[in-house]
Amino acid sequence: MSSRKRAAIIAAILIGALLLSILINSIITLVQKSNHPIKYSEYVEKYASEYNVPEYMLYAVINVESSFDESLRSEDGSIGLMQMSGDTVKLLSSDIHFDKDINIDSLYDPETAISYGAYYLRYLFNKYKKWDTAIAAYYAGEGTVDSWLNDTEYSEDGESLSKIPDKKTRSYVKAVKSAADYYKNTFYRNGVSVK
């Protein structure tokens, strides 16, 4: 085989490998984007701004909690996009921002769910000062997280969790962090939306 023919074959193989690599990368990107949609952006942007919660964090919590299914009701009675419980809604409705007589079924409305969820995330972040701890409290409850923070086995400083003892909460925090990282790195540059 001549060196010219060999060079042509090598070039064809390299071009084929490059095209295959581009195709695989495109498929991976499409799958990741389909697993991390951007929905209800009008409400996410509005309440992220109003309550000073990063948009990507709201998208991540909605994605992990409900996969953007506004009609979801879990076995424990949590409702809507942000899967909030009746007890949490009662707690939040005592705040001046919200209707004191809210019906729990109002959380099937995306705007209501995102409004309450964003407010609650800000409340938890203000209390715990770290997103990991706030996200753990969103899932497991404040009382549970407070008890972990008071236990030196789980918190070295009483302010942040060095270990999350509950496997489901640990998995939840990991899933939200992973989704938040994806949203942040894919749809935001220097805090500015590029979606």
Model-derived regions: residue spans:
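N-terminal Sec-pathway targeting helices
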Residues: 1-23
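Export/targeting segments at the very N-terminus of extracytoplasmic proteins
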Residues: 20-71, 93, 186, 194
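Second-shell loop/turn segments in exported
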Residues: 30-34, 45-47, 70-79, 99-110, ...
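Substrate-binding/active-site groove segments that recognize
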Residues: 47, 76-99, 115-117, 148, ...
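Short, functionally critical alpha-helical segments immediately adjacent to catalytic or ligand/cofactor-binding
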Residues: 52-70, 114-118, 134-140, 176
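Surface-exposed patches in mature extracellular/periplasmic domains of secreted proteins
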Residues: 57-59, 72, 101, 128-137, ...
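Cell-wall polysaccharide-cleaving catalytic domain and substrate-binding groove, primarily
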Residues: 63-88, 141
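Catalytic and substrate-binding regions of cell-wall glycan-acting enzymes that process beta-1,4-linked
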Residues: 127, 136-191
